[in-house]
């Protein structure tokens, strides 16, 4: 496991940040690139907008501060909320890094010209398909959309293999999801990208007429299935694994069905972007490097049960191979049309 320490290197009046890696770090690791025009001096502080649950991310941020000496001021919220805030703040945002629950919000900011490029030495660590093509943001972890089902009410064979089947009247009042959640909105965006606007709207209209149970968060939706109050839920895979780690898999009334290749089973990523106003900032660069380090990737495996994106790190036990779930026709960089998806959901009363 890698250990980090922060050191400020002064050369000819130019300040750059270096993260010295000790122990078993693989050969070829490089220091963050200094800005090409005028280097920015580190002040040892970082302002982070985090679109992830504080209980999950705060321990990693604390470890980052311990390892680097960089203090982090974090603002937490949902990824859609923070995306909207960043668009409103524009170039005047105090944020230096945005950590998002999904690729769509990151793409939206990139489209607005509000992010700076991730240095190649970091971006190239993550396999193509799980990070932006133009290095406007970097993938951190992977997660799969799944259908959670109540094993006491629904057999695995009865669970649909595709989300299109959920508009069938037989599922009326039996399906739940959090429409305000970033991952759900990215799924609907993926539906628009893969199946076209007309088919996506037909699905949204159909599911809205099927009396869905609308919730605030993925975890709360899964809880309804586990307690026998809901038959099916559209959630991210790792919520089930978090609960199973606490109570044991055998105690879980809910089980999961993965949907390889279907828009409803899409693989999305959490990711991070450096805001345009923080271009070349050494503390922002240090945080990006930390997120894709072996240490942080292992943290996500052990604590959030997500897929690591850094090659060589094993996924949590029991998960299908990530590559087996990926739809090759879906480019995560195409999920940037978040506002159109929100408008579609609002049109049919889901937001």
Regions found by a protein language model. Name each.
Residues 1-28:
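Secretory targeting and sorting signals
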Residues 146-153, 192, 268-280, 299-300:
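A bilobed periplasmic-binding-protein/Venus flytrap-type ligand-binding module shared by bacterial periplasmic
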Residues 104-108, 231-253:
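A ligand-binding cleft/hinge motif common to bilobed small-molecule-binding domains
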Residues 198-200, 306-351:
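An extracytoplasmic/periplasmic, membrane-proximal ligand-sensing/linker region
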Residues 24-43:
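Short, low-complexity, disordered segments immediately C-terminal to signal peptides
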Residues 143, 173-179, 204-208, 213-215, 250-276, 290-314:
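Periplasmic-binding protein-like
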Residues 50-58, 77-81, 87, 93-230:
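Extracytoplasmic ligand-binding site segments that recognize negatively charged/polar headgroups
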């Amino acid at each position: 496991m890698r250990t980090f320490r922060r050191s400020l290197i002064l050369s000819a009046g130019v300040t750059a940040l270096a993260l010295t890696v000790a122990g078993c770090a693989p050969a070829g690791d490089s220091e963050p690139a200094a800005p090409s025009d005028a280097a920015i001096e580190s002040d040892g502080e970082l302002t982070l907008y985090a679109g992830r649950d504080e209980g999950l991310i705060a321990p990693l941020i604390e470890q980052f501060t311990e390892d680097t000496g960089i203090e982090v001021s974090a603002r937490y919220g949902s990824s859609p909320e923070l995306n909207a805030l960043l668009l409103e703040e524009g170039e005047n945002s105090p944020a230096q890094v945005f950590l998002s629950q999904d690729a769509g919000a990151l793409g939206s900011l990139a489209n607005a010209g509000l992010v700076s490029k991730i240095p190649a030495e970091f971006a190239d660590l993550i396999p193509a398909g799980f990070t932006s093509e133009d290095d406007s943001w970097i993938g951190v972890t992977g997660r799969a959309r799944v259908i959670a089902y109540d094993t006491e009410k629904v057999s695995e064979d009865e669970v649909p293999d595709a989300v299109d089947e959920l508009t069938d009247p037989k599922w009326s009042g039996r399906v739940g999801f959090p429409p305000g959640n970033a991952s759900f909105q990215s799924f609907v965006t993926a539906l628009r990208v893969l199946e076209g606007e007309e088919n996506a709207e037909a699905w949204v209209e159909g599911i809205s007429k099927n009396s869905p149970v609308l919730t605030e968060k993925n975890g709360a939706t899964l809880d309804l299935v586990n307690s026998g109050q809901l038959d099916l839920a559209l959630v991210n895979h790792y919520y089930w694994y978090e609960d199973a780690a606490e109570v044991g898999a055998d105690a879980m009334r809910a089980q999961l069905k993965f949907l390889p290749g279907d828009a409803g089973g899409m693989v999305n990523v959490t990711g991070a972007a450096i805001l345009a106003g923080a271009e070349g900032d050494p503390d922002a660069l240090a945080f990006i490097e930390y997120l894709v380090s072996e240490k942080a990737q292992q943290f996500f495996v052990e604590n959030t049960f997500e897929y690591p994106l850094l090659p060589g790190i094993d996924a949590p036990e029991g998960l299908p191979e990530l590559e087996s779930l990926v739809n090759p026709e879906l480019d995560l960089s195409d999920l940037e049309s978040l506002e159109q998806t929100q408008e579609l959901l609002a049109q049919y009363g889901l937001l």
